[in-house]
A protein has these predicted regions:
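Short beta-strand element of the alpha/beta-hydrolase
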Residues: 33-42
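The serine-hydrolase catalytic nucleophile loop
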Residues: 44-56, 71
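Catalytic nucleophile-loop/oxyanion-hole region of alpha/beta-hydrolase
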Residues: 75-104
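Alpha/beta-hydrolase fold nucleophile elbow
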Residues: 104-115
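Glycine-rich nucleophile elbow surrounding the catalytic serine of serine-hydrolase chemistry
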Residues: 113-123
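Conserved alpha/beta-hydrolase
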Residues: 56-78
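N-terminal cap/lid segment of alpha/beta-hydrolase-fold proteins
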Residues: 2-30
């Protein structure tokens, strides 16, 4: 980007022909070297959601560049929502990490993700454990594979050995049964056990989508993890987003 580096840059990152909509936001001053945080939204979400942009701006304010990405089938990226799977999101994440590694100003790389994005960064972080300096899963939905194996997901019950061709997402859109079949094969516990670098988990204790017990269990299982519970808050932090931002700011300040 040169000496007059742009404060914000919109781009497409291509993952095997699929264009992923992305925005790079720089701290002040934009020039020089900076650590970077990749920020990933959740299921049915996008990178312009209130909690996603607020986390990115908080990180920009303490010297981090941020790279927000719309994942496969979400936001303004390619792909149909109904055809997205956790494998596709995971390969998206790995591609974005590789893109970030190629940016000449980047020193360290961190991953932050909300809900399904939180589980995605848990998986990608384990695969790139020698590259990623820290993880911030926000209300991570790592119960998805367990629900897929048990036959209860998205508020629906089904035979896990005979997965239906289509399911309904909570916003009314349909979801291909392959989403469930892929999820059944994933063991997030293995990813947690492989990751030894510092982790911050933030979770509302009245989360209506991902029970807070999953955040607590993941924090206990990680070798180096700080857990911050937000009293009385929901999955998307409708009541106390400021406390989430405070937790992220405190944990990340001075880390790179």
């Amino acid at each position: 980007m040169g000496e007059e580096r742009e404060k914000m840059k919109q781009m497409y990152i291509t993952d095997d022909g699929i264009r992923l909509n992305a925005k790079l936001d720089m701290p002040e001053p934009a020039e020089g070297k900076h650590p970077l945080v990749i920020v990933i939204h959740g299921f049915t979400g996008h990178m312009e959601e209130r909690h996603i942009t607020a986390v990115a701006k908080t990180l920009n304010g303490i010297g981090y560049a941020t790279l927000r990405v719309d994942m496969y089938g979400h936001g303004n990226s390619d792909g149909k929502f109904e055809n997205h799977t956790l494998y596709k999101w995971l390969t998206n994440a790995l591609t974005v990490i590789d893109y970030a590694r190629g940016l000449d100003f980047v020193t360290d790389i961190y991953l932050c993700g909300h809900s399904q994005g939180g589980m995605t960064v848990m998986l990608a972080g384990a695969m790139k454990h020698d590259v990623i300096k820290g993880l911030i899963p926000l209300s991570p939905a790592w119960m998805i594979p367990e629900g897929a194996r048990k036959g209860t997901l998205l508020g629906q019950d089904f035979d896990p050995d005979h997965v239906p061709d289509l399911l309904a997402a909570w916003d009314g859109r349909t979801l291909n049964g392959n989403y469930v079949r892929v999820a059944q094969t994933i063991r997030v516990e293995d990813a947690i056990d492989r990751y030894t670098v510092p982790v911050l988990i933030v979770h509302g204790d009245e989360d209506e989508a991902v029970p807070v017990e999953y955040g607590i269990e993941a924090a206990k299982r990680y070798r180096d993890c700080k857990l911050v519970l937000i009293p009385g808050d929901t999955h998307c932090y409708d009541h106390h987003l400021d406390q989430v931002l405070d937790a992220v700011r405190e944990w990340m300040t001075g880390r790179s």
